[in-house]
Amino acid sequence: MLARALAIVSGLMLGGCSLSGLLPDWTSTDVAGPEPAYRFMIANKLKDILGDPAPTDTLQISTATRIDSLKGASWRVCLKAQKFPLLPRYYAVFFQRGQMVDSRLSVLIDQCEIQSYSAYDWKADMNDPSVR
């Protein structure tokens, strides 16, 4: 009986060690990397994010916010797109190590509806990689 219990405990411990490589590193400071040039990258991938290169009457952008997620630390930037008279649509864009890793229509956990926004001239930012 004791041998079986020891075998089960040993198996669980070894299984836990092999799983550790699949989990993100939440403690490392460089997982998210430095703040990306998000305005430039979003301007060049706007069609992928919104589905249309110029889909709105107004387009606004928030500042980059560092967040922790299941994929590890990342930067979140929110976009507010409005085509009048329809209600605005919010999009969340995620960056890690200077690369865009994900984008989606904003969900409640992204908190894009409560962010502060500024006007976004994506045509001007498309050619200037120095803007953040």
Model-derived features with residue positions:
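Sec-dependent bacterial lipoprotein signal peptides
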Residues: 1-17
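Cystatin/cathelin-like cysteine-protease inhibitor module
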Residues: 18-132
